[in-house]
Amino acid sequence: MSTLVPYVIEQTGNGERSYDIFSRLLKDRIIFVDGEINDMSADLVVAQLLFLEAQNPDKDISLYINSPGGSVTAGLAIYDTMQHIRPDVQTICLGQCASMGAVLLAGGAKNKRYALPSSRVMIHQPWGGVQGQAVDINIQAKEIVRLKKLTIKYFAENTGKTEKQVAADMERDFFMSAEEALTYGIIDTVMNRRKDG
């Protein structure tokens, strides 16, 4: 089944121009992280972040996230790029930010991390399945532990919690409402609904 992407039409000095909705939003410096985070989706997000930095390194970028998480290494590629580029990256949770999605949400610029009122956030330790010879399993287990320590470190840095507290909270799936994510320090503001007029 193919994914339908809406198109918008704008009037320009040279007539009409049509854009897929995501390209049109990119013109307004809005990027979406939607669905599972994998190498392909991470490459697209990183490319958009770098493009917008090259276009204007002093103007904020908005990263809207609705993700159940996914590949830790792919998510960390996005996270590291967010930290590396000059523009502030404001993060907005809509729907859910789970696992690596929560790491990205917390990694937004300070005082520019948001969640919509009905959204949820979930943190947990990285997981992975391994198979093979004992020595290979040991190598992969060490890497999973390294990635766990790294995500704990990033959550601690971005929330103000201690690494010990974050590690304890990540032992199992730890779900939070938008208000609870605010109290935890993952976001800075629960967004109110826009008023008419």
UniProtKB/Swiss-Prot annotation:
Catalytic activity, EC: 3.4.21.92
Annotated compartments: Cytoplasm
Catalytic activity reported: Hydrolysis of proteins to small peptides in the presence of ATP and magnesium. alpha-casein is the usual test substrate. In the absence of ATP, only oligopeptides shorter than five residues are hydrolyzed (such as succinyl-Leu-Tyr-|-NHMec, and Leu-Tyr-Leu-|-Tyr-Trp, in which cleavage of the -Tyr-|-Leu- and -Tyr-|-Trp bonds also occurs)
GO annotations of cellular component type: cytoplasm; endopeptidase Clp complex
Complex formation: Fourteen ClpP subunits assemble into 2 heptameric rings which stack back to back to give a disk-like structure with a central cavity, resembling the structure of eukaryotic proteasomes.
InterPro entries per record: ClpP (IPR001907), ClpP/crotonase-like_dom_sf (IPR029045), ClpP/TepA (IPR023562), ClpP_His_AS (IPR033135)
Any Gene Ontology biological process: protein quality control for misfolded or incompletely synthesized proteins
Pfam families assigned to the protein according to its UniProt record, in alphabetical order: CLP_protease
Superkingdom: Bacteria
Function: Cleaves peptides in various proteins in a process that requires ATP hydrolysis. Has a chymotrypsin-like activity. Plays a major role in the degradation of misfolded proteins.
Family statement drawn from the similarity comment of this UniProt entry: Belongs to the peptidase S14 family.
Keywords (A to Z) from UniProt: Cytoplasm, Hydrolase, Protease, Serine protease
EC category: hydrolase
Species in which this protein is naturally found: Treponema denticola (strain ATCC 35405 / DSM 14222 / CIP 103919 / JCM 8153 / KCTC 15104)
Protein name: ATP-dependent Clp protease proteolytic subunit 1
GO molecular function, one term: serine-type endopeptidase activity
SUPFAM superfamilies in UniProt: ClpP/crotonase
Active site: S99 (nucleophile), H124
